[in-house]
Amino acid sequence: MEDFSSQEKLVETYLKENKKEQAVELLFNLIDQYAEARHFGKAESLRERLFEIDSMALDEIVKSADIIENAKMSAMDPAHTETWSHLYQHLTQEESIALYYGMQSAVYEPEQIIFQQGEMNPHLYLINAGRVKLFYHKDQHAILLNTLGPGELVGEDTFFTNSTCTASAMADSKVKLNIIEKSALHKWQSDEPNLVNKLQDYCSGLEPIKDLLQKKELERRTHPRHNISGSAAIKILDNKGSKVYKVDLSDISISGVSFIMNMSKTAADSLLGCRLNCKFTLRAAFSEISVDQEGCIVGVHGQLFNEYYINVKWEEPLDDGLLDRIKTFG
């Protein structure tokens, strides 16, 4: 960098001595060196200086723009561009550069809230690694809408509007994100308007939160629930060495089971999206039925005295014959 600084001073010396041609040549070489060193801001400011010194040095002005652009493309994280190839394939090289260098990077730890339902969120989040849970709160009820992973984004429902978030997002594991701020969107509207349109078109192709909510309600209505009593052993599969919890069964269907569990609100919210194993045995005078199923927690509903009504969706539907036998124990 010290050598760069001395060369910049030499440019000014050339100008004072009316050696414009030498100043342009040296400035062009400096732009190339800064771009190669990935100091893109400095390279761009020197290119502006080049234009000020000699606006007729068109060859150097055009070539320096290409040098910076190519260096920026080469410096883009290949893992990110591969993860988001389905987005970048719709963009020009200039738009790809504007998008990539217009984003910020962030890391969220497990159970850290990314944005909260009912609050303003001026960001769009692109997931590069990890899992994000999207859930909806109504009164004391929490419903898992979706679990998102690399190559998926979240926050699109409010990014292009001035409305509050209709759902909450929380890191389900350590999550690496790229964040687009609305200030970048406003800048692109003047500098890269097609990028804004393409990004909005891309987001409009995603399933809206209201549709996810309707789908959850339809799933709930499709398979009738049957009351069931007794206790079950629950083990959270996402946690290594997780202990077994004893819970009180409430109801069961082909697609899932519900039970009552005591815990804090924070712990309850963190369970959304977790995989579990559920074991229980129902006994009558001359028969018994054992169930050993794995599923995913899709709903958490607050009751009194730190009790929570937990909804689980089976990974594999319950056998019809087994359910018919369970119903006789009701």
What are these regions (language model features)?
Residues K246-V247, Q293-G299:
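Short beta-strand-centered aromatic/proline hotspots
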Residues V62-P110, K187-P224:
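Cyclic nucleotide-binding regulatory module and flanking cytosolic helices
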Residues L145-L199, L304:
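Cyclic-nucleotide recognition modules
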Residues A171-S173, D251, I297-G299:
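A residue-level detector for short acidic-glycine micro-motifs
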Residues N121, A129-R131, A232-R275, K279, ...:
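Short strand-loop-strand
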Residues I180, L185-E207, H301-G330:
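C-terminal output/interaction extensions
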Residues E82-D139, F259:
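Regulatory nucleotide-sensing modules
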Residues M1-A75:
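Repeat-based scaffolding regions
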